[in-house]
């Protein structure tokens, strides 16, 4: 198995994940809508799935407001000022003071945390939807979310849940950008071609007619592992950055961890592997 298979097996052993490890013959019988190479190994994680992101964000906001949080939307943050008895978060509309600050700024992390300059790359990542037979590739038909590790890179997808069809994207690759405010959201023909080639080989019954596309950004650390730490400028600032395309699924756990770090509570985790100064 490749790096992906070995990583899943190691995680399964460490965290007691419910998985089925099968050869390609068994996988072909179970999921005939996928075309597996003869030398592939397949793992099915029974409790895995996918998130409805906008619904999840709304739920987080609702729960936070219920707990007393105030939302200030539409502010552009200029800096988090240190040196005083309180930290100051300076925006284009007003200044907030706080005993501690959590920074989860994604592609803008290095703008607020100078120690991250040169440690992060921002990648433009196109996402694509394709027309697909609902009897084969829909969530209601039992089509699983999937990730293929192939000779041309890693590709993932989610079953169809609406009229847009099957969602597919390339996890590897990407187009490096320097300014997230100038992100070009137009279709990249080369990236579309890579995804189309993957579909022809491994999901041949999916239409090559794309129904939609959008663009997101990965903020990638040097080793593709999260950076979770206190800021060098002031220990009262805690942050998570460089989530490398995996951040949202960990949002609940990261939020709880960062809140405990900011308030000085014990969290019980060894964060050495995620420190900004790791080697």
Feature roles, as predicted:
Residues 100, 107-236:
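Active-site substrate-recognition segment that forms the wall
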Residues 3, 31-39, 81-88, 220-224, ...:
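A short, glycine/Asx- and small/polar-enriched loop/turn
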Residues 2-8, 24, 56-57, 109, ...:
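A general structural signal for well-ordered alpha-helical segments in protein cores
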Residues 13, 20, 24-29, 50, ...:
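Flavin (FAD/FMN) cofactor-binding core of flavoprotein oxidoreductases
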Residues 5, 31, 82, 112-114, ...:
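Short glycine-/acidic-enriched loop or helix-start segments at secondary-structure transitions
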């Amino acid at each position: 198995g490749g790096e992906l298979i070995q990583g899943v097996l190691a995680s399964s052993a460490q965290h007691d994940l419910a998985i089925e490890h099968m050869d390609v013959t068994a996988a072909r019988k179970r999921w005939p809508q996928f075309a597996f190479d003869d030398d592939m190994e397949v793992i099915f994680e029974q409790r895995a799935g996918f998130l409805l992101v906008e619904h999840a964000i709304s739920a987080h906001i609702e729960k936070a407001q219920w707990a007393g949080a105030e939302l200030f939307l539409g502010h552009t943050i200029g800096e988090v000022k240190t040196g005083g008895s309180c930290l100051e978060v300076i925006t284009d509309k007003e200044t907030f003071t706080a005993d501690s600050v959590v920074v989860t700024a994604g592609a803008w992390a290095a703008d607020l945390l100078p120690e991250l300059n040169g440690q992060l790359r921002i990648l433009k990542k196109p996402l694509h939807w394709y027309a697909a037979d609902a009897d084969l590739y829909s969530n209601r038909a039992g089509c699983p979310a999937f990730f293929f590790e192939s000779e041309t890179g890693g590709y993932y997808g989610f079953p169809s849940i609406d009229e847009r069809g099957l969602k597919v994207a390339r996890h590897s690759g990407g187009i490096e950008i320097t300014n997230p405010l100038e992100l070009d959201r137009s279709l990249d023909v080369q990236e579309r071609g890579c995804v189309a080639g993957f579909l022809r080989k491994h999901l041949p019954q999916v239409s090559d007619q794309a129904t939609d596309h959008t663009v997101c950004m990965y903020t990638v650390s040097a080793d593709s592992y999260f950076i979770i730490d206190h800021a060098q400028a002031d220990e009262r600032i805690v942050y998570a950055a460089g989530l490398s395309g995996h951040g949202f699924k960990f949002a609940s756990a990261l939020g709880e961890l960062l809140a405990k770090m900011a308030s000085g509570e014990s969290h019980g985790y060894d964060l050495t592997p995620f420190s900004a100064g790791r080697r």
